[in-house]
A protein has these predicted regions:
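Mg2+-dependent phosphoryl-transfer active-site scaffold
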Residues: 1-17, 59-62, 69-72, 76-319
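N-terminal leader/propeptide and maturation segments of large enzyme subunits in energy/redox metabolism
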Residues: 1-41
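General structural signal for alpha-helix termini and helix-helix connectors
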Residues: 23-27, 46, 253, 270
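Short coil/turn residues that cap or connect secondary-structure elements
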Residues: 25, 48-51, 214, 255
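Helix-rich "cap/lid" substructures immediately adjacent to catalytic or cofactor-binding pockets
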Residues: 29-71
Length: 319
């Protein structure tokens, strides 16, 4: 088993989320929230990953972490489960811009579900101590470090190896891990909204700040791409590509099938179009929907796209 074992994990996670549902949602959204939650939990259970969520939740509770003490990274913050467990303050059902659960959960199970979070230095120390004690009950098989500082654990693998990196390296996908990297909130606030896109556009709304964050931190999206499209008046800020969700939304807007839109968005996100070009079925789908040329050309320049939920979480937490 690659996830930590917790007896009756599926039931415990369902009960935990159900108890939080009516606290977090008003009556008019309860039905929608319950349907989304059931879909998310059904996939989490299919992955046999309920224990992963409980492991992280229990760890944060055990060390007395409050929402202000951590900020989760990546796509998992796009889930109602994350909102109910206070892993994010952003409600995926009502937030603007939108975030989509299929980017956090899909049916392919290509990698194990893992968690990465920025935490305060105090919470980092407490989590290190917590997992030292935890290892007497469960197998904390690998730890990872930067400059001697532990910032995460792998759980449930039979081999014991340590990983040394910079907190954002290519972590293995074949084992569950929980990364809790200590950050200085004040230093991060200073750098978070720096970059040419922020300087030129001077965003005022949350949505525009989210877009500029993506234009700054994704790769191959601003210079010789969105910058030119905006300068020439071809498209406005809201339409340029900064995240894979931007690709997904425009394709849906033009009537591309949702499943194909998802595949194309993920293909663009990884920079595969730039390296290998379009697949024939993708070209056919976009041409049939009259997707504009500027968009397909913009996609070919993308090296990597951040998930929108990641940018939203950072801006909501630190700005």
């Amino acid at each position: 088993m690659k996830y930590p074992y917790i007896k009756d994990a599926d039931i415990k996670l369902r009960n935990l989320c159900a108890n939080r549902l009516e606290v977090k949602y008003e009556e008019e959204l309860l039905k929608t929230a319950r349907q989304r939650l059931d879909w998310e939990l059904s996939l989490i259970e299919k992955y046999e990953a309920s224990s992963a969520w409980l492991t992280v939740y229990d760890a944060l509770k055990a060390v007395g972490a409050e929402e202000k003490d951590y900020c989760f990274r990546g796509t998992l913050t796009a889930l109602v489960v994350s909102f109910l467990l206070d892993f994010t303050a952003i409600d995926p059902l009502t937030c603007q811009p939108k975030i989509y659960p299929e980017f956090a959960l899909d049916d392919k199970k290509e990698r194990l579900m893992s968690f990465e979070a920025n935490v305060t230095s105090d919470i980092n120390k407490k989590l290190v101590a917590y997992f030292e004690e935890y290892s007497s009950k469960e197998n904390v098989s690998r730890r990872f470090f930067e400059e001697g500082l532990q910032y995460g654990v792998y759980i449930g693998d039979g081999q014991t190896r340590d990983y040394y990196g910079n907190g954002s390296g290519n972590l293995p996908t074949d084992v569950f891990y929980f990364s809790f990297f200590p950050v200085d909130r004040e230093k991060l606030q200073v750098t978070l909204k720096k970059g040419i896109a922020f300087e030129l556009i001077k965003p005022e709304t949350f949505e525009d700040n989210v877009k500029c964050y993506g234009l700054t931190h994704s790769t191959g999206v601003w210079e010789d791409n969105a910058e030119i499209l905006i300068e020439k008046g071809i498209v406005s800020l809201k339409d340029v590509i900064a995240y894979r969700e931007d690709v997904f939304e425009l394709l849906l807007q033009y009537g591309v099938d949702r499943e194909m839109a998802y595949v194309i968005a993920d293909y663009v996100r990884k920079g595969i179009v730039r390296k290998r070009g379009w697949q024939p079925e993708m070209i056919q789908a976009m041409n049939s929907a009259n997707v504009p040329v500027w968009f397909t050309e913009s996609c070919t320049k993308v090296v990597y796209l951040f998930p929108r939920a990641h940018g939203m979480s950072f801006l909501e937490k630190y700005c």
